[in-house]
From Swiss-Prot:
This is Olfactory receptor 51Q1. It holds the Pfam family 7tm_4. GO terms for cellular component: plasma membrane. The gene is OR51Q1. Residues 49-56, 123-141, 220-239, 297-317 are cytoplasmic.
Length: 317
Protein backbone atom coordinates (compact mmCIF):
# COMPACT_ATOMS: atom_id res chain seq x y z
CA UNK A 1 0.00 0.00 0.00
CA UNK A 2 2.93 2.30 0.71
CA UNK A 3 4.05 1.84 -2.89
CA UNK A 4 0.77 3.23 -4.19
CA UNK A 5 1.04 6.23 -1.89
CA UNK A 6 4.61 6.96 -2.88
CA UNK A 7 4.04 6.69 -6.60
CA UNK A 8 1.31 9.26 -6.60
CA UNK A 9 3.64 11.95 -5.27
CA UNK A 10 5.60 14.45 -7.35
CA UNK A 11 9.00 12.75 -7.09
CA UNK A 12 8.18 9.58 -8.98
CA UNK A 13 10.47 8.07 -11.58
CA UNK A 14 10.29 5.57 -14.42
CA UNK A 15 12.57 2.70 -15.41
CA UNK A 16 13.60 2.51 -19.05
CA UNK A 17 14.01 -0.84 -20.81
CA UNK A 18 17.11 -1.75 -22.76
CA UNK A 19 17.22 -4.44 -25.47
CA UNK A 20 15.93 -7.60 -23.71
CA UNK A 21 18.39 -10.48 -23.72
CA UNK A 22 21.35 -8.33 -24.76
CA UNK A 23 22.16 -6.64 -21.46
CA UNK A 24 25.75 -7.92 -21.53
CA UNK A 25 26.35 -6.52 -25.01
CA UNK A 26 25.45 -2.87 -24.41
CA UNK A 27 28.87 -1.54 -25.42
CA UNK A 28 28.85 -3.47 -28.70
CA UNK A 29 25.25 -2.49 -29.47
CA UNK A 30 26.07 1.15 -28.75
CA UNK A 31 28.56 1.24 -31.67
CA UNK A 32 26.00 0.86 -34.52
CA UNK A 33 23.42 2.91 -32.58
CA UNK A 34 25.96 5.71 -32.10
CA UNK A 35 26.81 5.55 -35.82
CA UNK A 36 23.11 5.96 -36.71
CA UNK A 37 22.77 8.97 -34.41
CA UNK A 38 25.95 10.47 -35.89
CA UNK A 39 24.65 9.98 -39.45
CA UNK A 40 21.37 11.63 -38.49
CA UNK A 41 22.96 14.64 -36.78
CA UNK A 42 25.66 15.20 -39.41
CA UNK A 43 23.32 14.55 -42.35
CA UNK A 44 20.55 16.89 -41.22
CA UNK A 45 23.02 19.55 -40.07
CA UNK A 46 24.77 19.40 -43.46
CA UNK A 47 21.48 19.78 -45.34
CA UNK A 48 20.53 22.78 -43.19
CA UNK A 49 23.96 24.36 -43.70
CA UNK A 50 23.87 23.80 -47.48
CA UNK A 51 20.35 25.27 -47.80
CA UNK A 52 21.41 28.29 -45.74
CA UNK A 53 24.75 29.00 -47.44
CA UNK A 54 24.42 27.82 -51.06
CA UNK A 55 22.67 30.26 -53.46
CA UNK A 56 21.81 27.40 -55.85
CA UNK A 57 19.32 25.95 -53.34
CA UNK A 58 17.78 29.24 -52.22
CA UNK A 59 14.41 28.15 -53.59
CA UNK A 60 11.02 27.84 -51.95
CA UNK A 61 10.84 24.05 -52.19
CA UNK A 62 14.01 23.77 -50.08
CA UNK A 63 12.41 25.73 -47.25
CA UNK A 64 10.17 22.70 -46.68
CA UNK A 65 13.23 20.43 -46.80
CA UNK A 66 14.90 22.58 -44.14
CA UNK A 67 11.76 22.20 -41.98
CA UNK A 68 12.01 18.42 -42.39
CA UNK A 69 15.72 18.43 -41.49
CA UNK A 70 15.05 20.56 -38.38
CA UNK A 71 12.27 18.17 -37.33
CA UNK A 72 14.51 15.14 -37.84
CA UNK A 73 17.28 16.82 -35.86
CA UNK A 74 14.85 17.55 -33.01
CA UNK A 75 13.61 13.96 -33.03
CA UNK A 76 17.18 12.65 -32.88
CA UNK A 77 18.25 14.92 -30.03
CA UNK A 78 15.11 14.01 -28.05
CA UNK A 79 15.89 10.29 -27.88
CA UNK A 80 19.70 10.50 -27.89
CA UNK A 81 20.25 11.20 -24.14
CA UNK A 82 18.18 8.33 -22.71
CA UNK A 83 19.25 5.76 -25.31
CA UNK A 84 22.98 6.43 -25.06
CA UNK A 85 23.13 6.80 -21.28
CA UNK A 86 21.32 3.47 -21.02
CA UNK A 87 23.74 1.72 -23.40
CA UNK A 88 26.93 3.37 -22.12
CA UNK A 89 26.30 3.75 -18.40
CA UNK A 90 23.33 1.42 -17.79
CA UNK A 91 21.36 4.40 -16.36
CA UNK A 92 17.77 3.21 -16.56
CA UNK A 93 16.04 5.56 -14.13
CA UNK A 94 14.46 8.76 -15.45
CA UNK A 95 12.59 11.34 -13.38
CA UNK A 96 8.92 11.95 -14.09
CA UNK A 97 9.57 15.54 -15.21
CA UNK A 98 12.29 14.46 -17.64
CA UNK A 99 10.04 11.67 -18.91
CA UNK A 100 7.11 14.03 -19.47
CA UNK A 101 9.41 16.49 -21.26
CA UNK A 102 10.71 13.74 -23.54
CA UNK A 103 7.12 12.57 -24.11
CA UNK A 104 6.13 16.09 -25.23
CA UNK A 105 9.04 16.62 -27.63
CA UNK A 106 8.95 13.06 -28.96
CA UNK A 107 5.29 13.14 -29.96
CA UNK A 108 5.50 16.80 -30.99
CA UNK A 109 8.34 16.20 -33.45
CA UNK A 110 6.69 13.00 -34.74
CA UNK A 111 3.47 14.87 -35.52
CA UNK A 112 5.51 17.71 -36.99
CA UNK A 113 7.29 15.31 -39.34
CA UNK A 114 3.96 14.06 -40.66
CA UNK A 115 2.64 17.61 -41.12
CA UNK A 116 5.79 18.75 -42.94
CA UNK A 117 5.54 15.79 -45.34
CA UNK A 118 1.92 16.75 -46.01
CA UNK A 119 3.01 20.33 -46.76
CA UNK A 120 5.73 18.99 -49.07
CA UNK A 121 3.16 16.93 -50.98
CA UNK A 122 1.13 20.11 -51.54
CA UNK A 123 4.33 21.79 -52.73
CA UNK A 124 4.87 18.95 -55.24
CA UNK A 125 1.27 19.26 -56.43
CA UNK A 126 1.52 23.02 -57.03
CA UNK A 127 4.93 22.68 -58.72
CA UNK A 128 3.71 20.01 -61.17
CA UNK A 129 0.05 20.88 -61.69
CA UNK A 130 0.26 24.70 -61.50
CA UNK A 131 3.87 25.53 -62.49
CA UNK A 132 3.03 28.97 -63.88
CA UNK A 133 1.37 30.02 -60.62
CA UNK A 134 3.87 28.34 -58.27
CA UNK A 135 5.72 31.53 -57.34
CA UNK A 136 2.51 33.45 -56.67
CA UNK A 137 0.83 30.64 -54.66
CA UNK A 138 3.75 29.49 -52.50
CA UNK A 139 5.39 32.76 -51.54
CA UNK A 140 7.96 32.97 -48.75
CA UNK A 141 5.28 34.48 -46.54
CA UNK A 142 2.89 31.57 -47.19
CA UNK A 143 5.63 29.03 -46.47
CA UNK A 144 6.59 30.86 -43.27
CA UNK A 145 2.98 30.91 -42.10
CA UNK A 146 2.67 27.22 -42.98
CA UNK A 147 5.70 26.38 -40.83
CA UNK A 148 4.34 28.46 -37.94
CA UNK A 149 0.92 26.81 -38.26
CA UNK A 150 2.53 23.35 -38.20
CA UNK A 151 4.41 24.17 -34.98
CA UNK A 152 1.34 25.64 -33.28
CA UNK A 153 -0.95 22.77 -34.31
CA UNK A 154 1.50 20.09 -33.15
CA UNK A 155 2.13 21.80 -29.80
CA UNK A 156 -1.60 22.31 -29.21
CA UNK A 157 -2.26 18.68 -30.18
CA UNK A 158 0.28 17.21 -27.74
CA UNK A 159 -0.29 19.51 -24.75
CA UNK A 160 -3.76 18.13 -23.79
CA UNK A 161 -2.47 14.54 -23.72
CA UNK A 162 0.45 15.70 -21.56
CA UNK A 163 -1.79 17.47 -19.04
CA UNK A 164 -4.32 14.62 -19.04
CA UNK A 165 -1.53 12.17 -18.24
CA UNK A 166 0.16 14.33 -15.57
CA UNK A 167 -3.03 14.58 -13.49
CA UNK A 168 -3.27 10.77 -13.11
CA UNK A 169 -1.62 8.66 -10.37
CA UNK A 170 1.02 6.11 -11.34
CA UNK A 171 0.74 3.18 -8.98
CA UNK A 172 1.70 0.16 -11.03
CA UNK A 173 5.19 -0.95 -11.99
CA UNK A 174 7.32 1.97 -13.16
CA UNK A 175 8.92 -0.18 -15.86
CA UNK A 176 8.53 1.22 -19.37
CA UNK A 177 8.83 -1.15 -22.32
CA UNK A 178 11.18 1.10 -24.31
CA UNK A 179 14.28 3.24 -23.83
CA UNK A 180 12.25 6.48 -24.03
CA UNK A 181 8.89 7.79 -22.86
CA UNK A 182 5.91 7.24 -25.18
CA UNK A 183 2.25 7.96 -24.37
CA UNK A 184 1.01 4.42 -25.03
CA UNK A 185 3.77 3.06 -22.81
CA UNK A 186 3.20 5.43 -19.87
CA UNK A 187 -0.59 5.20 -19.88
CA UNK A 188 -0.56 1.50 -19.03
CA UNK A 189 1.15 2.29 -15.70
CA UNK A 190 -1.77 4.44 -14.52
CA UNK A 191 -4.17 3.06 -11.89
CA UNK A 192 -7.13 5.36 -12.63
CA UNK A 193 -9.77 5.82 -15.30
CA UNK A 194 -7.88 6.37 -18.56
CA UNK A 195 -10.79 6.37 -21.01
CA UNK A 196 -10.43 10.09 -21.79
CA UNK A 197 -6.67 9.70 -22.33
CA UNK A 198 -7.18 6.63 -24.50
CA UNK A 199 -9.80 8.26 -26.69
CA UNK A 200 -7.74 11.41 -27.12
CA UNK A 201 -4.64 9.37 -27.96
CA UNK A 202 -6.68 7.28 -30.41
CA UNK A 203 -8.01 10.44 -32.11
CA UNK A 204 -4.48 11.82 -32.50
CA UNK A 205 -3.18 8.51 -33.85
CA UNK A 206 -6.10 8.41 -36.28
CA UNK A 207 -5.26 11.92 -37.45
CA UNK A 208 -1.58 11.13 -38.02
CA UNK A 209 -1.86 7.59 -39.40
CA UNK A 210 -4.99 8.04 -41.54
CA UNK A 211 -5.81 11.69 -42.29
CA UNK A 212 -2.30 12.96 -43.16
CA UNK A 213 -1.43 9.96 -45.40
CA UNK A 214 -4.89 10.15 -47.01
CA UNK A 215 -4.33 13.81 -47.94
CA UNK A 216 -0.87 12.92 -49.26
CA UNK A 217 -2.38 10.11 -51.38
CA UNK A 218 -5.01 12.52 -52.72
CA UNK A 219 -2.33 15.05 -53.70
CA UNK A 220 -0.32 12.35 -55.51
CA UNK A 221 -3.46 11.03 -57.22
CA UNK A 222 -4.02 14.51 -58.63
CA UNK A 223 -0.33 14.72 -59.59
CA UNK A 224 -0.51 11.33 -61.35
CA UNK A 225 -3.67 12.37 -63.19
CA UNK A 226 -1.90 15.52 -64.38
CA UNK A 227 1.26 13.61 -65.36
CA UNK A 228 -0.66 11.05 -67.43
CA UNK A 229 -2.11 13.94 -69.41
CA UNK A 230 1.33 15.23 -70.44
CA UNK A 231 2.67 14.73 -73.93
CA UNK A 232 5.70 12.44 -73.60
CA UNK A 233 7.01 9.66 -71.36
CA UNK A 234 10.17 11.72 -70.77
CA UNK A 235 8.12 14.50 -69.18
CA UNK A 236 6.21 11.97 -67.09
CA UNK A 237 9.40 10.33 -65.83
CA UNK A 238 10.99 13.71 -65.07
CA UNK A 239 7.93 14.79 -63.06
CA UNK A 240 7.83 11.49 -61.15
CA UNK A 241 11.57 11.67 -60.47
CA UNK A 242 11.10 15.12 -58.92
CA UNK A 243 8.66 13.62 -56.40
CA UNK A 244 10.53 10.36 -55.77
CA UNK A 245 12.53 11.68 -52.80
CA UNK A 246 9.36 12.84 -51.08
CA UNK A 247 7.58 9.53 -51.76
CA UNK A 248 10.49 7.62 -50.19
CA UNK A 249 10.47 9.95 -47.16
CA UNK A 250 6.72 9.32 -46.73
CA UNK A 251 7.25 5.54 -46.84
CA UNK A 252 10.17 5.73 -44.39
CA UNK A 253 7.95 7.54 -41.86
CA UNK A 254 4.58 5.81 -42.22
CA UNK A 255 5.58 2.15 -42.66
CA UNK A 256 7.39 2.00 -39.25
CA UNK A 257 4.66 4.19 -37.68
CA UNK A 258 1.92 1.77 -38.78
CA UNK A 259 4.11 -1.15 -37.67
CA UNK A 260 4.49 0.29 -34.16
CA UNK A 261 0.75 1.00 -33.90
CA UNK A 262 -0.18 -2.50 -35.08
CA UNK A 263 2.33 -4.09 -32.71
CA UNK A 264 1.00 -2.07 -29.77
CA UNK A 265 -2.64 -2.79 -30.65
CA UNK A 266 -2.57 -6.43 -31.79
CA UNK A 267 0.70 -7.90 -30.47
CA UNK A 268 0.65 -6.88 -26.82
CA UNK A 269 1.89 -10.31 -25.75
CA UNK A 270 4.72 -10.43 -28.27
CA UNK A 271 8.32 -10.57 -27.10
CA UNK A 272 9.53 -7.29 -25.53
CA UNK A 273 12.38 -7.43 -28.03
CA UNK A 274 9.86 -6.97 -30.87
CA UNK A 275 8.40 -3.83 -29.26
CA UNK A 276 11.84 -2.33 -28.61
CA UNK A 277 13.10 -2.99 -32.15
CA UNK A 278 9.92 -1.64 -33.78
CA UNK A 279 10.02 1.53 -31.67
CA UNK A 280 13.70 2.12 -32.45
CA UNK A 281 13.11 1.67 -36.19
CA UNK A 282 10.16 4.08 -36.05
CA UNK A 283 12.17 6.83 -34.33
CA UNK A 284 15.54 6.32 -36.03
CA UNK A 285 14.60 5.48 -39.62
CA UNK A 286 13.30 8.91 -40.76
CA UNK A 287 16.11 11.07 -39.26
CA UNK A 288 18.78 8.69 -40.62
CA UNK A 289 17.27 7.95 -44.03
CA UNK A 290 15.90 11.37 -45.04
CA UNK A 291 19.31 13.09 -45.44
CA UNK A 292 20.54 10.08 -47.43
CA UNK A 293 17.44 10.04 -49.66
CA UNK A 294 17.59 13.76 -50.44
CA UNK A 295 21.35 13.88 -50.93
CA UNK A 296 21.29 10.87 -53.30
CA UNK A 297 18.17 11.74 -55.30
CA UNK A 298 18.45 15.53 -55.47
CA UNK A 299 21.17 16.82 -57.78
CA UNK A 300 20.93 20.40 -56.51
CA UNK A 301 21.57 19.23 -52.94
CA UNK A 302 24.50 17.17 -54.24
CA UNK A 303 26.00 20.17 -56.03
CA UNK A 304 25.34 22.34 -53.01
CA UNK A 305 27.16 19.88 -50.76
CA UNK A 306 30.11 19.65 -53.17
CA UNK A 307 30.36 23.45 -53.43
CA UNK A 308 30.10 23.80 -49.67
CA UNK A 309 32.80 21.18 -49.04
CA UNK A 310 35.12 22.61 -51.71
CA UNK A 311 34.78 26.13 -50.29
CA UNK A 312 35.41 24.76 -46.80
CA UNK A 313 38.59 23.02 -48.01
CA UNK A 314 39.79 26.22 -49.70
CA UNK A 315 39.30 28.26 -46.52
CA UNK A 316 41.10 25.65 -44.41
CA UNK A 317 44.26 25.86 -46.55
Amino acid sequence: MSQVTNTTQEGIYFILTDIPGFEASHIWISIPVCCLYTISIMGNTTILTVIRTEPSVHQRMYLFLSMLALTDLGLTLTTLPTVMQLLWFNVRRISSEACFAQFFFLHGFSFMESSVLLAMSVDCYVAICCPLHYASILTNEVIGRTGLAIICCCVLAVLPSLFLLKRLPFCHSHLLSRSYCLHQDMIRLVCADIRLNSWYGFALALLIIIVDPLLIVISYTLILKNILGTATWAERLRALNNCLSHILAVLVLYIPMVGVSMTHRFAKHASPLVHVIMANIYLLAPPVMNPIIYSVKNKQIQWGMLNFLSLKNMHSR
